Amino acid sequence: MTNATQHANENLTIHLKVKDYATWRSGYDGREKGRLSAGITNGRVFRNAQDPNDVVILQDVADVAKARAWLGSDHLKTEMQKNGVVGSPNVRFAAVA
């Protein structure tokens, strides 16, 4: 399996709590350009039926190193705080089995 093929099979799952879903969602949607530049695509957002401020995001990743760098950036951390993310998100990379 080539390196490119391996990267095409990577997924990113982020579980987070937010103060207000509508505020957070507006910020999330506004960061699409940043996600694309980090090789993160095809984002699907899910909300807990019992707690609409409990959010899970599932995304495809083309380049794990680029995605990790973007996720760890001070700019993104500031934006997440500004948009109401509570605490630290649970971030997991997984390969399609």
PLM region spans:
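Short S/T/G/P-rich N-terminal loop/turn motif that feeds into the first structured element of a domain
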Residues: 1-79, 83-97
